[in-house]
Design a protein with these regions (language model features):
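Dinucleotide-binding/catalytic capping subdomain of oxidoreductase cores
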Residues: 18, 64-124
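A conserved FAD-binding loop/helix module that cradles the flavin
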Residues: 55, 68, 77, 174-198, ...
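Flavin-dependent oxidoreductases
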Residues: 1-85
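Active-site-proximal substrate-binding core of FAD-dependent oxidoreductases
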Residues: 199-227
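A broad structural signal for alpha-helix termini and local helix breaks/kinks
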Residues: 8-10, 134, 199-202
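Mid-domain beta-loop-alpha active-site segment that forms a flexible
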Residues: 1-4, 126, 190
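Flavin (FAD/FMN) cofactor-binding core of flavoprotein oxidoreductases
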Residues: 15-23, 27-31, 102-181
């Protein structure tokens, strides 16, 4: 959430900005834990944007959740009203002065934002989106909120959401922007790739190239990534 701000502070990636979205979840009671054998994902209603619609998630402990939505917020820490009010004016001015202006005035984006805000204000609205493919779910039986998380998506000067991670190398800094889930599930190989790039450019020195973490061996990962 702060990666763009750090880059901007040293005059890097000034053509990019970020917008923040809070993903919220609802936990289901135990009677639903055997409803499916796997998580179930729907086709996103707005495929031009980097969000998955609320889906059915089976956690490693066997519990199940519905979510997430993608509620626009004004801070990477915008979990409550006070934080969003504090950051509202500076974030709006930042967005209006960047490519995000084109995005927020786009009709499809406005439809997405309105839909996601509705799903945050109403539990039933969110759960009904999952009920389309799991009709046995009863919103009245789901009363416990799950964990929320905030992701920051990068927008370019043309008002387009950038789908991929951005690596920017400067003389005295190296920036990783727009690195979000589900890409973050490849964190260990990606970390090895970043370290390898820094090492090649003499921005990082290490003699421990045989380093190993559990089944992960640095040299083996790099060899496979560079094939």
């Amino acid at each position: 959430g702060n990666a763009i701000d750090i880059a901007h502070n040293i005059k890097v990636a000034k053509n990019l900005t970020d917008v923040h979205f809070r993903g919220e979840y609802w936990r289901t009671p135990k009677k639903y834990h055997n409803l499916t054998k796997t998580s179930v994902y729907s086709v996103p209603e707005f495929p031009d944007y980097p969000f998955l619609d609320p889906h059915w998630i089976i956690r490693v402990d066997g519990s199940c959740e519905i979510g997430p939505n993608a509620v626009p917020v004004f801070s990477p820490y915008g979990y409550d009203t006070a934080e969003n009010i504090k950051e509202f004016i500076p974030k709006v001015f930042e967005m209006l002065g960047s490519g995000a202006r084109k995005a927020i005035f786009d009709k499809q984006f406005q439809e997405l934002a309105f839909s996601e805000i509705q799903s945050s204000m109403s539990k039933s609205v969110m759960i009904e989106r999952v009920k389309k493919f799991l009709p046995k779910i009863n919103p009245k039986e789901i009363t416990e909120k799950g964990t929320a998380g905030i992701r920051s998506s990068v927008i370019n000067e043309n008002g387009k959401f950038i789908p991929d991670v951005i690596l920017l190398e400067e003389e005295t800094s190296f920036h990783i922007l727009n690195y979000n889930s589900p890409g973050a599930t490849g964190a260990l190989p990606f970390s090895a790739h970043v370290i390898n790039q820094l090492h090649k450019k003499s921005l990082f020195e290490s003699e421990d190239i045989e380093a190993q973490c559990g089944p992960w061996k640095f040299n083996d990962i790099i060899e496979k990534l560079e094939k």
